[in-house]
């Protein structure tokens, strides 16, 4: 079963799950976080059913709601929460674990607090449970932009600048506007720099990143967890309806993988349920996943995965592998969000630079030196290379 966004069907006859049966993972601060987060990423699609889908998710037992200002629907999610309260699905928003994200365009220190206030007002709450910086640099793109969109003002990760943003995020925690803080789309190099330079009570407790059976990110996840940072995976179902700018012929669909299909057949379960079970059970159930759907049966199924262990140890091993030639698993480093629309000029158009830590700068002065060297090199290249 491929979860297609166009298929919308809400059915009140489907019984909710008991939220207390959903597995939770402890954060470094001692709080518990539901591993299953209902996603609201829909920024390039019509929002006419997102309110109903989110309210239905709450009715069916979801208690972790994942939002972001970049999705352009915090107001819609806020109305869904109010609707859930009116309908009696929850007594108040305090029953929810709400994750929000600071958008790249609001990373200037003066913009962080106003961005949070906008989020709180849109959601209709005084506090959220988790606030993440969405990406580690302030590069932006326009909604619905094309694959080849580039922002000439984009820059690589500059640690000096990020620390200034992070300090403002920490102030939000001190002010009681957010309970816990975390990151999203960080790499090992950027996280090492952050952990080096912040106090113990300023450390992120959660990092959200792309993870699914064909992009398992095992080494990176182990690094984060060694530092006490819980990992949650977005694109958990391969996001078959992601924007066109993030769809390329090189991509593979997780639910078309023969191993996923074979295990689904063995269990008599859906392909989506197998993919999410991998996300819920891997690494001793220490992380989480983000998933969304617009049918009541799928919404319930996606949550039910977090209430039991669907996969046997043998089935889990077939997906994960064990680092041996005999059992490599199915990880194919199949990244679906390349992030090419965030590239800076010095990256020369190679989206891999976003993820391989080859252009991580400590200071603004260091970036200016790097930029000048790059520009000089390209000037010589243009002057000496045959142009045909």
Predicted regions and their residues:
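Beta/alpha (TIM)-barrel catalytic core signal, keyed to glycine-rich beta->alpha loops juxtaposed to Asp/Glu
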Residues: 104, 135-388
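Structured beta->alpha junctions
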Residues: 42, 69, 102-104, 213
